[in-house]
């Protein structure tokens, strides 16, 4: 953009210089034309006297009459054929200022056309660069939107991944808890019972055996007492009280 502004300023400077040169050349051409038009022959007194002497109208005229003078000398020198030939010779030998002005004007027009063409090219280049910059800005905005959408999608995927990790850890914890629970199924014959169940069976058997022994001893004592009551003569003192009884025989 800075180069484009610099080129536009340079072109504006060229236009102002060309306009100033054109105005200066026009002023010089006007001065030259006015100088050429003022190129008249000076008055000659001797030739004027000869004209009066030879003229019949002037001879027949009375004194005191106002005679109109033919201002031959006031005519421009270009009207005479001799002067025209001289002017042609001079124009062929010396460069005419009008021709130089025309040449300068032609060169100025060529330079002006070249500058206009250069200006049009710069404007087209500027327009192309502007359109290219606009397209680049649009592409940048589109890329920004794509990046924002990709980031949002990445965030969503990260959240889903975190939720899946959490669910997986919960499932692992539940599986670990299930594996630590005791089995409620009945033990098979091949598998030995646990220690607690064995101790319980042993205790039950010992108490049952003790209960059975006590019952048998009680039954034997009752039978012995009944027999002693029925046969008192056969009672022989042994130094023991009848309540002690005989030792049990199993």
Swiss-Prot record:
Q: Which domain of life is it from?
A: Eukaryota
Q: Where is the composition biased (Basic residues)?
A: 178-187
Pfam families with a match to the protein in the record: MAGSP
Q: Where is the composition biased (Polar residues)?
A: 82-95, 240-250
Its GO biological process annotations read:
mating
Where do the record's glycosylation annotations fall on this chain?
A: 83, 90, 131
Q: Which UniProt keywords apply?
A: Behavior, Glycoprotein, Secreted, Signal
Q: Kindly indicate where the leader peptide sits in this chain.
A: 1-18
Q: What post-translational events are described? A: Proteolytically cleaved as it is secreted and in the recipient female.
Protein name, entry field: Accessory gland-specific peptide 26Aa
